[in-house]
Design a protein with these regions (language model features):
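Auxiliary alpha/beta "docking" domains used to position bulky ligands
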Residues: 1-87, 126, 135
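Inter-helical turn/loop segments and adjacent helix faces that build the functional surface
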Residues: 78-85, 105, 125-128, 151-158, ...
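Flavin-dependent oxidoreductase catalytic cores
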Residues: 83-93, 103-106, 194
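Iron-sulfur cluster-binding cysteine motifs and their immediate structural context
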Residues: 93-117, 123, 137-161, 227-232
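Short microdomains enriched in Cys/His and/or Lys/Arg
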Residues: 113-129, 163-181
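C-terminal amphipathic alpha-helical segment
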Residues: 128-161, 179, 183-186, 190-194, ...
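Amphipathic alpha-helical scaffolding segments comprising HEAT/armadillo-like alpha-solenoid repeats
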Residues: 185-187, 216-232
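Structural detector for internal amphipathic alpha-helices that build alpha-solenoid repeat scaffolds
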Residues: 202-219, 233
């Protein structure tokens, strides 16, 4: 709900590269954060930052999995760290928690069923069988992470960049659905949410409103119901 993490993390990685260059001299490098086909989770695992959970995300033994990954490619000769062994054991809480059954087996994710994919990447209508499990989620889903015991160690981000802005953490679905395209662009400027565009924003909220009809002030409002149906088409 804060600033676009792609930009924040890339900027911080670039500053890190500049500090390294100041210490060792010019060196070849490039930074990434969800900005290129880089296997960030697997690279992080091999770098010893954690192990891959059954939900396919990286788990750090002291920070859980609720963090962003960024990558700094370099041509500097560095000593490789040892990979962290798996600590998930027989736990399957993340698999059981997934609302749409997207984690089809340990370490295997069917992205076509993942709520994060459906609400962020998918263009067009969300398949009807997957609408009800989405519940009131309108941008992504973290249920598999919330269910993970290792996230008892997770802490809120310390950077003010990631603090919720514009009341997004308290707004009702009806209020958000009423945003015009201009208001959407203005209030979500600098946020990763803006990337999905106003049309998909309305589609996602329409699905959520359909799932909570009668609980969020929609029932009986003919104009609102008509707008929801139009967004779902």
């Amino acid at each position: 709900l804060g600033r676009d993490y792609h930009k924040v993390v890339r900027a911080r990685l670039q500053k890190l590269a500049e500090r390294i260059a100041a210490a060792v001299g010019p060196f070849g490098h490039r930074v990434f954060c969800d900005s290129a086909p880089v296997m960030e989770v697997e690279l992080a695992r091999r770098a010893g930052l954690g192990w891959r959970g059954k939900h396919t995300l990286l788990i750090h033994p002291k920070r859980g999995s609720t963090f962003f990954l960024g990558t700094l490619y370099t041509d500097l000769p560095l000593t490789a760290d040892e990979a962290e062994p798996d600590h998930c054991g027989s736990c399957t809480r993340c698999i059981e928690a997934c609302p749409t059954g997207a984690i089809v087996s340990p370490w295997r994710l069917d992205a076509r069923r993942c709520i994060s994919y459906l609400t962020i990447e998918l263009k067009g209508a969300i398949p009807e069988p997957l609408r009800a499990p989405i519940g009131n989620r309108i941008y992504g889903c973290d249920d598999c992470q919330l269910a993970c015991p290792w996230n008892r160690f997770a802490r809120p981000a310390a950077l003010p960049d990631f603090a919720a802005r514009n009341g997004l953490d308290a707004a009702s679905l009806v209020e958000l659905f009423g945003w015009s395209a201009e208001e959407f662009d203005a209030r979500l400027a600098g946020s990763p949410i803006r990337r999905i565009g106003h049309e998909r924003w309305l589609r996602n909220i329409a699905v959520a409103l359909g799932n909570v009809t009668g609980k969020d002030g929609v029932a009986g409002e003919t104009s609102a119901i008509a707008a929801v149906r139009a967004a779902l088409a």
